């Protein structure tokens, strides 16, 4: 049997490979075949990517647009056609940090060396976003498998494959649906490490904070939902300790960890 670190690395590689395969086979990177939604918000990311593409900078590094109307497709066209723009025309969107704009802007600049065509780079960014979402969902499915068995994991992941909203939305460069799952994944990892080691490693608390911070830096929308997702695995562990194992003390310990995770999550939100 492989050592635990090697097993973990092999599992992660397998998850990424399967996620990439699903993105390719199900055409999630194609706006034509699987559609898009909420193009108005995505415009902010296209504006930021194009700003970085032009070598322009604005204080704060926020998302933004080069037009007064966010609802049209102009900023996307500016990016895809590599149209020269006036730096003074950029209107920053300062309601969030805009981490996704910086991330995709960096990736786009790397892609330019191999993909000079704007449409090809857009498809590559969609492919990356969708692959990360599938990878996050597969990791959740593995956690469900470990606790409830393969049938529950299969049904759960099938709901992702069959959900039109997710199939269309996972490519969206503004919403970045994979970041919605980061707080849940951090909490699941905390629970896993605690069960394996018998105590919670100190590094799990800043991991929870970092997961919430990254999500909030991509937008504060639905933050209460993400915080609830972060607490669900720990609340389940507390309930299992009390009702299944008949261990009131163990349940209290898990409730304490739930509070700790909540404090860490709020710290991440505040930092964002």
Regions found by a protein language model. Give the residues of each.
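Start-transfer (signal-anchor) and selected internal transmembrane alpha helices
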Residues: 1-24
């Amino acid at each position: 049997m492989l050592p635990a670190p090697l097993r973990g690395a092999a599992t992660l590689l397998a998850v990424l490979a399967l996620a990439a395969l699903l993105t390719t086979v199900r055409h999630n990177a194609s706006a034509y075949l699987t559609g898009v939604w909420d193009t108005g918000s995505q415009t902010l990311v296209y504006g930021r990517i194009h700003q970085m593409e032009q070598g322009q900078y604005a204080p704060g590094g926020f998302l933004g647009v080069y037009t007064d109307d966010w609802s049209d497709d102009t900023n996307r066209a500016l990016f895809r056609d590599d149209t020269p723009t006036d730096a003074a025309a950029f209107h920053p969107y300062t309601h969030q940090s805009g981490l996704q704009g910086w991330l995709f802007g960096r990736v786009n600049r790397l892609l330019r060396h191999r993909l000079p065509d704007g449409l090809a780079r857009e498809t590559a960014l969609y492919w990356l976003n969708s692959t990360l979402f599938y990878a996050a969902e597969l990791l959740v499915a593995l956690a469900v498998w470990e606790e409830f068995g393969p049938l529950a994991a299969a049904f759960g992941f099938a709901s992702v494959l069959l959900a039109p909203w997710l199939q269309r939305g996972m490519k969206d460069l503004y919403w970045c649906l994979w970041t919605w799952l980061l707080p849940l994944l951090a909490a699941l990892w905390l629970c896993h490490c605690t069960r394996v080691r018998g105590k919670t490693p100190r590094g799990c608390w800043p991991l929870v904070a970092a997961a919430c911070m990254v999500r909030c830096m991509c937008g504060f929308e639905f933050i209460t939902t993400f915080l609830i997702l972060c607490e669900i695995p720990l609340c389940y562990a507390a309930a299992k300790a009390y009702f299944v194992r008949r261990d009131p003390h163990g349940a209290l310990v898990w409730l304490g960890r739930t509070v700790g995770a909540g404090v860490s999550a709020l710290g991440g939100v505040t930092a964002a």
